[in-house]
Design a protein with these regions (language model features):
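Conserved P-loop NTPase "ATPase switch" module shared by AAA+ and STAND
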Residues: 106-119
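Conserved RecA-like helicase ATPase core segment
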Residues: 123-207
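Basic/charged alpha-beta structural segments of nucleotide/phosphate-handling enzymes
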Residues: 1-105, 160, 170-200
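Flexible, charged surface loops at secondary-structure boundaries
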Residues: 103-108, 131-132
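A short catalytic or substrate-binding loop motif that flags glycine-/basic-rich loops and adjacent residues
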Residues: 80, 119-120
């Protein structure tokens, strides 16, 4: 809906895509593209700046940048988009840090983040601000504790990459990274012996 509204408001400024404004499939695809760009940390203005240097597709990319900017304008400050909520939280935290303060939503709070499987730009920005502001931030990842091997595409490779990114982010923000604690006891299923047995079977081949 918001992509369609952005197209309607742009009207004569959009040549390639305006005729698709009533296509639900196009609007959905455009919204997904915008979401991917936002996850990569790119804004509509940045895309507009990059588009002219993209060869034959520069015209279409420039129009996509206009749609993206219109979409951002319609959403500005509303927090309707989950990615925007992360950006708004990071804005508030960074502004408070610049004043030497901590926002109310983080005062006297312990921060625990459970099982990142992705680590996009908005999350990275908010995490960096929290690492700079808070005494401790605890992150739980699903990992086997083995060292990361370059080129590894195994089950736990994503978690290992996230752990490496977190250590780098901590150093960048002047925070120390604690030695990881590997939990080998299955506390999650302590009250469900059947599930505990299945978990052990999957991990070891016996139960």
């Amino acid at each position: 809906v918001l992509v369609r509204r952005a197209l309607e408001e742009l009207q004569d400024h959009v040549h390639y895509y305006y005729r698709h404004r009533r296509s639900a499939a196009f609007c959905q695809m455009a919204a997904q593209t915008i979401d991917e760009l936002k996850s990569a940390g790119l804004s509509g203005a940045q895309l507009a700046e990059l588009a002219p240097d993209c060869g034959p597709e520069s015209g279409k990319l420039s129009e996509l940048a206009l749609i993206f900017q219109g979409y951002e304008t319609l959403l500005a400050g509303t927090g309707m988009d989950p990615a925007d909520r992360l950006e708004l939280a990071a804005d508030r935290l960074e502004a408070a840090l610049a004043r030497g303060e901590l926002p109310d939503f983080l005062r006297e709070r312990e921060v625990f983040i459970d099982e990142f499987d992705t680590f996009n730009a908005p999350k990275k920005r908010l995490m960096g601000a929290m690492l700079a502001a808070l005494p401790t931030v605890t992150v739980a990842l699903c990992d086997d504790g083995a060292p990361m091997v370059p080129g590894d595409m195994g089950l736990f490779s994503g978690a290992k990459q996230v752990a490496a990114q977190l250590r780098q982010l901590a150093r960048k923000n002047g925070a120390d990274a604690a030695v990881p604690e590997l939990l080998r006891r299955d506390l999650r299923h302590k009250d469900a012996p059947g599930l505990a047995a299945v978990t052990e079977l999957l991990e070891t081949g016996t139960c």
